[in-house]
């Protein structure tokens, strides 16, 4: 185990939540810009669903943040969870 507690492992949805706050963008606006359902976005924001590559690409368009950033966040999260579970 890496010494990380579960609470220290940050899901990409937390970062997305912060980005939305910083851009003063509502979830409803994100739904309109991405064409993704409110249910899916809420699930990502709550850390219940992982961020898919296709959603990352839609975020790139909607937020002007490269899809690679979101994919890398998800990959890092997945790796940390695996390490935590060892």
Features from the language model and the residues they span:
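Short amphipathic recognition helices of helix-turn-helix/homeodomain-type DNA-binding modules
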Residues: 69-86
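A short, Lys/Arg-rich alpha-helix, primarily the initiator
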Residues: 1-26
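Residue-level detection of the helix-turn-helix DNA-binding "recognition helix"
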Residues: 35, 46, 75
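DNA-binding alpha-helical recognition surfaces that contact promoter or target DNA
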Residues: 18, 43, 72
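Short alpha-helical DNA-recognition segment
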Residues: 25-43
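Short, basic-rich loop-to-helix N-cap that marks the start of a DNA-contacting helix
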Residues: 48-62, 78
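Alpha-helical residues within the helix-turn-helix
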Residues: 21, 32, 43, 57, ...
């Amino acid at each position: 185990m890496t010494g990380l507690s579960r609470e220290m492992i940050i899901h990409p949805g937390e970062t997305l939540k912060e980005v939305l706050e910083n851009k003063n963008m509502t979830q409803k606006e994100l739904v309109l810009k991405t064409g993704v359902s409110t249910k899916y976005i809420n699930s990502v924001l709550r850390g219940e669903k992982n961020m898919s590559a296709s959603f990352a690409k839609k975020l790139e368009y909607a937020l002007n943040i490269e899809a690679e950033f979101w994919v890398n966040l998800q990959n890092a999260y997945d790796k940390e969870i695996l390490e935590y579970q060892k």
